[in-house]
């Protein structure tokens, strides 16, 4: 195996992982569970949570899995009472119904507080838990489970260098040196046994979609797209591939944002990005009766493309990255429909000229709408590309080459929307 292939596979294994619940409140639950693992008395006297503005934005409205309630107070209480920090972003996957009264009592007792930290980090979480005997503080930055500091009273348990406020991981730094052609060639040519693990994304996220169709989560957007035919307002999903892609992706997001206890396979630290990169590819694979190898290669191409594009974006920002995740899906769907590398480039260029720049105004049930928007853009972009049509580079942020366009999208998210984030949070906190 070449060194480049090893780096690509490591990027997939680092960036495509299961997560139960929206990853920002789950990072707080992970922090609380980490603290509790160091306490022996465990009679909680206080839990203090401090998070960066982007984490606060993404935790205000989204449901904490298994609790039926949103917010950081509930997330911290859930992690403290029912969390297992050893399983990372699946920290509260084992939460039981019998835990719920204790969790909600703690969350609403006044013992748990959450505030915005005055830090420049895109992603920062600090949790302090006091019991009758000890005080433990954990600090996380850079990624959702990256602990750089852990203290118990005056004892330092973990003391790593704090990541720079906008630092990129090793995987992101590697991806930034690559190009889309290298991503495409890897997904097409890497021995299948090296990629087989990517099938889990298909399995997990389709199960989440089915849960969204079965239960009334959030906006019930996925259900409503199929149900539109009852009102003579649409064709439903049975005979409409585009609608089916949108409905399945929206249903999975409905479930995730609505508090389902099933894990999503995430991408770039986001379940909704993972859903967006996965579901359209899975639906397309079913439509063309793809082989297992074609499905796996398409998922690997989709997720690695999404990771490549996201490597130029902040881990959290005002840029809704379901759109960049859907660009990954576009590549995977083009491959399944016997398209070429050039067709995939054209599909992504078409998307860049469409909905790139959709804002992230925090996690919540409306994320399903944004997932649907991104997948709809993907369908239009691929449809044009497969018919030989591409938006000319005289238009907007569409550049002469695919990699220039991707770098431009990175600039849009990193520089262009920098001042947008605090305005969004101010509106959210003062309405």
Curated annotation (Swiss-Prot):
GO terms for biological process: L-cysteine catabolic process to pyruvate. Signal peptide: none annotated. Coiled coil: none annotated. One of its GO terms (molecular function) is L-cysteine desulfhydrase activity. Belongs to the UPF0597 family. This is UPF0597 protein LCA_0156. It comes from Latilactobacillus sakei subsp. sakei (strain 23K) (Lactobacillus sakei subsp. sakei). The lineage of its organism: Bacteria, Bacillati, Bacillota, Bacilli, Lactobacillales.
């Amino acid at each position: 195996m070449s060194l480049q292939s090893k780096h690509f596979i490591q990027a997939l294994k680092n960036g495509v992982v299961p997560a139960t619940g929206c990853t920002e409140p789950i990072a707080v639950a992970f922090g609380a569970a980490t603290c509790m693992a160091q306490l022996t008395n465990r009679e909680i006297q206080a839990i203090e949570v401090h998070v960066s503005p982007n984490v606060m934005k993404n935790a205000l409205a989204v449901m904490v899995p298994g609790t039926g309630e949103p917010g950081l107070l509930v997330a911290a209480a859930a992690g403290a009472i029912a969390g297992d920090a050893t399983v990372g972003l699946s920290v509260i996957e084992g939460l039981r119904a019998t835990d719920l009264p204790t969790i909600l009592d703690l969350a609403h007792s006044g013992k748990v507080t959450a505030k915005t930290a005055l830090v420049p980090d895109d992603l920062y979480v600090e949790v302090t838990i006091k019991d009758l005997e000890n005080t433990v503080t954990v600090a996380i930055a850079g990624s959702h489970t990256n602990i750089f500091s852990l203290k118990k009273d005056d004892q330092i348990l973990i003391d790593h260098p704090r990541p720079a406020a906008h630092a990129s991981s090793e995987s992101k730094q590697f991806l930034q040196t690559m190009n889309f052609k290298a991503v495409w060639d890897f997904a097409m040519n890497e021995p299948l046994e090296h990629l087989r693990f990517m099938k889990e994304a298909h399995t997990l996220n389709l199960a989440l979609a089915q849960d969204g169709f079965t239960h009334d989560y959030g906006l019930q957007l996925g259900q409503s797209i199929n149900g539109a035919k009852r009102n003579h307002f649409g064709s439903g999903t049975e005979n409409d591939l585009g609608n089916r892609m949108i409905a399945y992706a929206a249903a999975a997001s409905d479930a995730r944002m609505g508090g389902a206890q099933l894990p999503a396979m995430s991408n770039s630290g986001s379940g909704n990005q993972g859903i967006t990169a996965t579901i359209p590819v899975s639906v397309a694979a079913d439509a063309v009766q793809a082989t297992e190898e074609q499905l796996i290669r398409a998922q690997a191409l989709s997720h690695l493309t999404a990771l490549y594009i996201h490597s130029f974006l902040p881990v959290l920002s005002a840029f809704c990255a379901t759109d960049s995740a859907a660009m990954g899906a576009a590549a995977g769907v083009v491959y399944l429909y016997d398209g070429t590398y050039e067709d995939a480039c054209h599909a992504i260029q078409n998307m860049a000229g469409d909905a790139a720049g959709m804002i992230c105004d925090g996690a919540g049930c409306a994320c399903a709408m944004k997932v649907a928007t991104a997948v709809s853009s993907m369908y239009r972009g691929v449809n044009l590309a497969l018919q030989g049509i591409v938006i000319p580079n005289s238009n907007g942020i569409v550049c002469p080459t695919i990699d220039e366009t991707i770098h431009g999208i990175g600039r849009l998210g990193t520089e262009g929307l920098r001042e947008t984030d605090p305005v969004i949070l101010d509106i959210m906190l003062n309405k």
